Amino acid sequence: MVFPPEAPFRFLNLNVLLGMTGVSFDQIDNWHGVDPKDAFDLQFCLEGRNCGTTYKQYHSVKSELDYQPNVVQLRLGERLNFEGRWPAYQIRYSQPEANLQLSMDFDTWDGFHWWVYIPKIYCHYTSFGSCRIKWQWNDDEGTIESPALHDHGWGRNLLPFRLPLNVFRYEVLRLTGGGFAISLWTEAPGRLELKNTGLLRWDAHQYQPMEHYECQVLEWEYFANYAGQKCRVPRRWIGKQNSNAGEFTYEAERRTDPRSIMGDGFLYGFDYQGQWSGSPGRKIEGEGYVEQLGRYFH
């Protein structure tokens, strides 16, 4: 989720991955258990205005994870508890080493949801909703309620090909008024485009599907990923989403350090200023975050 500007945080991202994904950072050498299929990867980032905290660690599905088949219920010791039933979910997260406690209650909005499907390879389903967060971090505590996203889906393990995606870029922008602009751009090796799509969700009721996303990088920097490999990371870029109804164009600048919890790629926050050319036209500015995977991002 991307927080409102008056909040003490920029964004929060919590990922739960079951099984090895097969990209270059996610190999048996990094898994110390017996069976790689037993891997449970927990990724977390809470980016504050002045500081942040992250977590990335493999756990064992068999020995550490409590879950119930055919229902939404996951428990990883005292660190994570995720449960609920459509349309409401409850998440409890604890990071004792950072003196952090979070309690999150997510209520799904009615109506439209965003679905991205690559046959036999990938499925990504986004639910939109409101999330009430009660937090305690060191000596500070508080409660925030804000629009949020719940992404869930599956991806086929492509490990036999030994080739990671050339690009996986997932952007989430908070729009004026609490809506979202989201985009997903994926490329296979050889710059073969797999899926490129987007969406403007103005509020709980209005939305505009977008057909294509473009990214023109204006300035690069280099950072080491989770595997210690040097990767190019955009510092400034121009993003563009197109549709028959109009064009959303914005210039963005990264405002946080790239967090390497995603292994082959990074998670980072940015500010942006943009323009929607459709009817009615409007200027849009705010904050967002990126999930970027792929060493060969061009």
Give names to the regions the model predicted:
Residues M1-H298:
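Structured soluble/peripheral alpha/beta segments that form catalytic or ligand/cofactor-binding pockets
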